[in-house]
């Protein structure tokens, strides 16, 4: 094994020189330059500084403006809550531990940080799945006369929490475990060892299939069908400028959504699966650290993609920030009027 395994930790370095120490008790500066820990702390501070305001603003603006309190926006609010879970449960902890160079909060802190980071990420992921299914059902109409109501939204929120819990809770009760990973300043599921009594192998396979491949397939299917529906509508009205504009908007939105999903989760899932299937292979601490924080940074660009690109929300947000006035109101109104004139309007094919 090209690493050192101890009680509830795995260090990606062979302890031939005797310098490897527990990441709960000693600084891990022998793994990487101390400057890397400072950079990690700075990056976490940046995510807190940007992720908290934009997600809090999402909650505040939605609660302030009655016209935003729609059934679908409950899912978007759930997404913002999930991102705030990651900010407070994961980013603040990682920033604090990186300042010390090791997981100074101990085993209990590792469980708490790993749980909240996993829970927040999974709630966000399954919220995106619910959004994709909702857009597919509403726009493509596989179920005739279907109307997305508040009850459907509540069920979608409950579904996202249940699915997130089925991923975040098991490591707390003995099916796998949370251990420090990468530079040993944040905690995640144990992909690294086959520790006796934890059944890591079965949990990782379960998590990869149910909590990565399944959401990926659903999102691709739903937005693929959505794009086809918009193209068919545009073909039926080839001379309609507003329809063609709606198609371009949806195409751009779908591309951004897919890229956002893949950028967040594909690197992390791929590296985790590689480590799991190649246990004993030599790799450095940055090998897992970098993709892990690609996934965590989704707390910043999730609301930018799924909420700030919504015209109605953007209008309300500007109104709130400008003390009740929108200096761009005439331009926003004209754009909205043009889009609503289309039989395939942006309100039907955008995330909200």
UniProtKB/Swiss-Prot annotation:
Stretch list, region Disordered: 331-352
GO BP annotation list: absorption of visible light; G protein-coupled opsin signaling pathway; visual perception
Membrane topology reported for the UniProt record: Multi-pass membrane protein
Top-level division of the source organism's lineage: Eukaryota
Membrane side Extracellular: residue ranges: 1-36, 97-110, 174-202, 275-286
Gene3D superfamilies, per database record: Rhodopsin 7-helix transmembrane proteins
PTM per Swiss-Prot/TrEMBL: Phosphorylated on some or all of the serine and threonine residues present in the C-terminal region. Contains one covalently linked retinal chromophore.
Disulfide bonds: 110-187
N6-(retinylidene)lysine PTM positions: 296
Cellular localization per UniProt: Membrane; Cell projection, Cilium, Photoreceptor outer segment
Stretches of the chain found on the membrane's Cytoplasmic side: 62-73, 134-152, 225-252, 309-352
Known function: Photoreceptor required for image-forming vision at low light intensity. While most salt water fish species use retinal as chromophore, most freshwater fish use 3-dehydroretinal, or a mixture of retinal and 3-dehydroretinal. Light-induced isomerization of 11-cis to all-trans retinal triggers a conformational change that activates signaling via G-proteins. Subsequent receptor phosphorylation mediates displacement of the bound G-protein alpha subunit by arrestin and terminates signaling.
Protein family according to the UniProt entry: Belongs to the G-protein coupled receptor 1 family. Opsin subfamily.
The protein's name in its UniProt record: Rhodopsin
Organism: Pomatoschistus minutus (Sand goby)
Gene (name only): rho
